[in-house]
């Protein structure tokens, strides 16, 4: 299993329906062939609660090493990915919802003052609720209540859910940084990042270079490189190598020879593949295969 996206890495899964765009689902990383879900984004806000085991989760330029009980708020339209840590499975509950459930309709006072400034703030990809601040426990308890209501309340369900979403939002808002106001510039930059990630996803098995990627975006190589590092906090080359390693895991799980895996995932040879794999995963491909078996 893997998350299905379009050519721009937008997730195609429906989160609820048009009448009530809200979804709560129990997930576990071992359901994914690679023990991870790949980079994707969606226009809905997502909040995760880890219920068992750890997870390494990255969103745009930030990486979190989450543990059981942690909650992660992922803003709308933010690229994110998650993977196992130390081969441990992770169970988590995911809540995704359309921001309109918070503000009624675009143009309203609630939407303009309290919702739009957050979802258009591209410098705010995530908030980690991990008990490091006094308000975190209240947020976590209310989020658990939301999950329970969504799963067990047949009467007035939509009203009960909306009420708790708004209470969560009211609790979260005072602790968020003020948006810079450079909405159009930031939106354009992250649209380019999504195009870069999509290009890598579609071509990682080939010999692609910075020149190829920058040409795809109609940017000069230096600007393309600076843009990616600024927005993702990693060089484009390192990101490409790490992505190729993640994609190679499904072949490792199928017991394919390392030479064939290297060829299928864009590495020049099996030795280079093994070297990069060790840097990314902390063990060789063969050691990884033994630990997974």
Tell me what each language-model feature is.
Residues 197-198, 202, 207-214, 219, ...:
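Terminal helix-turn-helix DNA-binding modules in bacterial transcription factors
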Residues 77-100, 110:
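Ligand-binding loop in jelly-roll beta-barrel domains
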Residues 110-164, 198:
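Amphipathic alpha-helical segments enriched in hydrophobic/aromatic residues interleaved with Lys/Arg
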Residues 169-172, 176, 200, 228, ...:
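Hydrophobic recognition helices of helix-based DNA-binding modules
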Residues 1-71, 77-78, 86, 112-113, ...:
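Generic protein-terminus/edge-of-domain signal
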Residues 69, 223-228, 272-273, 277:
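Short hydrophobic/aromatic patch on the recognition helix
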């Amino acid at each position: 299993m893997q998350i299905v996206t379009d050519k721009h890495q937008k997730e195609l899964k429906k989160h609820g329906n048009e009448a009530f765009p809200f979804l709560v689902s129990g997930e576990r990383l071992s359901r994914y062939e690679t023990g991870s879900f790949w980079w994707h984004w969606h226009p809905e806000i997502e909040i995760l609660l880890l219920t068992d085991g750890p997870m390494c989760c990255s969103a745009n330029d930030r990486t979190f090493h989450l543990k059981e009980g942690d909650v992660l708020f992922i803003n709308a339209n933010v690229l994110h990915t998650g993977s196992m840590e130390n081969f441990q499975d992770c169970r988590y509950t995911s809540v995704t919802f359309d921001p309109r459930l918070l503000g009624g309709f675009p143009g309203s006072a609630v939407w303009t003052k309290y919702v739009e400034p957050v979802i258009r703030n591209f410098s705010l990809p995530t908030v980690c609720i991990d008990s490091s601040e006094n308000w975190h426990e209240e947020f976590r308890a209310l989020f658990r209540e939301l999950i329970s209501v969504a799963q067990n309340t047949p009467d007035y369900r939509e009203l009960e859910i909306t009420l708790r979403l708004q209470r969560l939002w009211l609790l979260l808002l005072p602790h968020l940084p003020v948006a810079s106001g450079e909405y159009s510039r930031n939106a354009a930059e992250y649209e380019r990042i999504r195009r870069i990630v999509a290009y890598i996803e579609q071509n990682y098995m080939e010999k692609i270079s910075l020149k190829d990627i920058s040409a795809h975006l109609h940017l000069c190589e230096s600007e393309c490189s600076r843009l990616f590092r600024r927005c993702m906090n990693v060089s484009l080359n390192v990101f490409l190598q790490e992505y190729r390693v993640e994609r190679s895991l499904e072949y490792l799980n199928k017991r394919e020879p390392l030479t064939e895996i290297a060829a299928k995932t864009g590495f020049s040879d099996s030795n280079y593949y093994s070297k990069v794999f060790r840097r990314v995963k902390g063990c060789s491909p063969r050691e990884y295969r033994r630990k997974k078996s």
